[in-house]
């Protein structure tokens, strides 16, 4: 969620992501680089005069992220069907591509899918791998939507927008009709 906040404030996220303080390994949650997050909260507090904590930054980001999703919904987008990957990203796309990495793809089919590749055509293997990967992506969307407080169609729930304080009458009406 921090990425949204960085963009809203015109800040570069590189120092936060790429420069890890030496003492970071001694923090309670080293993967989060909490020292940087705390500094950004202090920075925001100093600029705005409003006391801000790292949790406040997350909440600001979450509000905007959900509001952007709602705006997309209003524009005819912002649902599960729009959360897709390009065909190319699920690959392999061509027979040649599959065959150039046949060992790798064959191993994935056997270990992850439980698909026996012996005697199968390249096209059959490609179709099986694609079907598996697309199903995995659907599972990922389910997990992301649940974590964000959205419904199975990828739309923020009324409960979510109320908890974020963005339950404006037009937002509620939109979610009731399209959510």
Please place each PLM-identified region on the residue numbering.
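Extended C-terminal regions of large enzymes
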Residues: 1-179
